[in-house]
């Protein structure tokens, strides 16, 4: 089977990672001891994508848990599914990264990285046919951002032909832990642009807005935000975990979603939005799901898709529903909003349907969009970065760990280039190309 090795790094990465394993273990009928208690063959058919089968029929997540301090891992271990993980796969330091990207990437993280790679290698070697890696981390802290990106580049070196997929939590001033988040995020994006194949941008700003506006939670906690993240992660991995035709592995997803290698930052969305512990009082119809899924308010990245255009889209519907109706609704969305889809990639919307809905819902839909509007998110970080960097504020924390100012300047310009690349394809039309070609032919003649 096509296995995925999952890594989680730093406090945020471990918290959303632990939540992800709770949710998918539940969907696959696996209890906290790793025993299967499910009721459907579909749950086991592709179980080895994320789980190893151990002696005595126990299922163990193929997960590597990494942090530079023991705190978060202790709470994962004592959490509801803490005993399901392989004890050797907890790799942690004692020093912490102090929200400093340089500590995670160059000093503290670099000391720990080899022991992490040993565990990763061991997991990869026991795979029948490894398809790739997924990492959950945040871009605002020190460990997830600094050490997370270090791990990515090391794994890339060792497994250059495997897919690298990340779930990256983007910082926001609305839910801010540290003042240097824009630095850490910019330095991380600089790495992600070059070293990942697919990155889901999970934006704290958007999660906060959803909790506040849609779910009417006056003081959203990280638990509330993580509930949304785990629903989204469960949705986008559905095609990988359950039998189906479309985007059934990471590489096929990348082929469908990434028209240009640098533009691999996806905007996830989810419908229906529910708050923790609440139940839906009525099942939504397919048209409602489709309409909600494309709504800017349901996006997990704080960008308005109406300010850009979609290069590609993948949608995953879950639950028992009519395929015909799903196809009709998806076509309907494209026809009504055709100006929001680039016309130079025909058939750029793909839809998958999976029979098994997430817990507590009859039907749900997950949205994965590669939209040029994601540049708004990078612009937001870039502005905050520049404001501090032009005064060289807080730089000594980074230079003290051996970093050079030059690296900041490079990261800044790489991010600005990324923004202009998105803009360039947003403005591109199908006709333009023809004109250029004609001119070129004349010159040749």
Swiss-Prot record:
Keywords: Acetylation, Cell projection, Cilium, Cytoplasm, Cytoskeleton, Deafness, Disease variant, Flagellum, GTP-binding, Isopeptide bond, Leber congenital amaurosis, Magnesium, Metal-binding, Microtubule, Nucleotide-binding, Phosphoprotein. Mg(2+) binds at residue 69. Some glutamate residues at the C-terminus are polyglutamylated, resulting in polyglutamate chains on the gamma-carboxyl group. Polyglutamylation plays a key role in microtubule severing by spastin (SPAST). SPAST preferentially recognizes and acts on microtubules decorated with short polyglutamate tails: severing activity by SPAST increases as the number of glutamates per tubulin rises from one to eight, but decreases beyond this glutamylation threshold. Glutamylation is also involved in cilia motility. The modification Phosphoserine is found at residue 172. Ubiquitous. Residues 429-445 have a biased composition (Acidic residues). GTP binds at residues 11, 69, 138, 142-144, 204, 226. The keyword Magnesium applies. InterPro entries: Beta-tubulin_BS (IPR013838), Beta_tubulin (IPR002453), Tub_FtsZ_C (IPR008280), Tubulin (IPR000217), Tubulin/FtsZ-like_C (IPR037103), Tubulin/FtsZ_2-layer-sand-dom (IPR018316), Tubulin/FtsZ_GTPase_sf (IPR036525), Tubulin_C (IPR023123). Residues 426-445 are annotated as: Disordered. GO terms for cellular component: axonemal microtubule; azurophil granule lumen; cytoplasm; cytoskeleton; cytosol; extracellular exosome; extracellular region; extracellular vesicle. One of its GO terms (biological process) is natural killer cell mediated cytotoxicity. The modification Phosphothreonine is found at residue 55. CDD domains: beta_tubulin. The highly acidic C-terminal region may bind cations such as calcium. The MREI motif is common among all beta-tubulin isoforms and may be critical for tubulin autoregulation. Tubulin is the major constituent of microtubules, a cylinder consisting of laterally associated linear protofilaments composed of alpha- and beta-tubulin heterodimers. Microtubules grow by the addition of GTP-tubulin dimers to the microtubule end, where a stabilizing cap forms. Below the cap, tubulin dimers are in GDP-bound state, owing to GTPase activity of alpha-tubulin. This is Tubulin beta-4B chain.
């Amino acid at each position: 089977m096509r296995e995925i090795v999952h890594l989680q790094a730093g406090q945020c990465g471990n918290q959303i990672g632990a939540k992800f394993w709770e949710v998918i273990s539940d969907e696959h009928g696996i209890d906290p001891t790793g025993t299967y208690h499910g009721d459907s063959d579909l749950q086991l058919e592709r179980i080895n994508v994320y789980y190893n089968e151990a002696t005595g029929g126990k299922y163990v997540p193929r997960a590597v848990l990494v942090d530079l301090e023991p705190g978060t891992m202790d709470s994962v271990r004592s959490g509801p599914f803490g005993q399901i993980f392989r004890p050797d796969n907890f790799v942690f330091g004692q020093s912490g990264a102090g929200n400093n990207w340089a500590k995670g990437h160059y000093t503290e993280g670099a000391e720990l990285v080899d022991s992490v790679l040993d565990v990763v290698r061991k997991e990869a070697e026991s795979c029948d046919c490894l398809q790739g890696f997924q990492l959950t981390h945040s871009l605002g802290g020190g460990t997830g951002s600094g050490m997370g990106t270090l791990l990515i580049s090391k794994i890339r070196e060792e497994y250059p032909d495997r897919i690298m997929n990340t779930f990256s939590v983007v910082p926001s001033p609305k839910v801010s832990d540290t003042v240097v988040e824009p630095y850490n995020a910019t330095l991380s994006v600089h790495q992600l642009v070059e070293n990942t194949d697919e990155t889901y941008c999970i934006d704290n700003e958007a999660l906060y807005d959803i909790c506040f506006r849609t779910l009417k939670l006056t003081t959203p906690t990280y638990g509330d935000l993580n509930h949304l993240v785990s629903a989204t992660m469960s949705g986008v991995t559905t095609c990988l975990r359950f039998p189906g035709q479309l985007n059934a592995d990471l590489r096929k997803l990348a082929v469908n979603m990434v028209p240009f290698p640098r533009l691999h930052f996806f905007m996830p969305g989810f419908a229906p939005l529910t708050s923790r512990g609440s139940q839906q009082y009525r099942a939504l119809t397919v048209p409602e799901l489709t309409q909600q899924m494309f709504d800017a308010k349901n996006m997990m990245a704080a960008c308005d898709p109406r300010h850009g255009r979609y290069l590609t889209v993948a949608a995953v519907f879950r639950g028992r529903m009519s395929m015909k109706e799903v196809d009709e609704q998806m076509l309907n969305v494209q026809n009504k909003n055709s100006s929001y889809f680039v016309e130079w990639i025909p058939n750029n919307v793909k839809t998958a349907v999976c029979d098994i809905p997430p817990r507590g819902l009859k039907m749900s839909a997950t949205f994965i969009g590669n939209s040029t509007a994601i540049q708004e998110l990078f612009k937001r970080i870039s502005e905050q970065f520049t404001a501090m960097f032009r005064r060289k504020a807080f730089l000594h924390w980074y230079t003290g760990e051996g970093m050079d100012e030059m690296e900041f300047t490079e990261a800044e310009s790489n991010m600005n280039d990324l923004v202009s690349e998105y803009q360039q394809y947003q403005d591109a039309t199908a006709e333009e190309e023809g004109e250029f070609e004609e001119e070129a032919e004349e010159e040749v003649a």
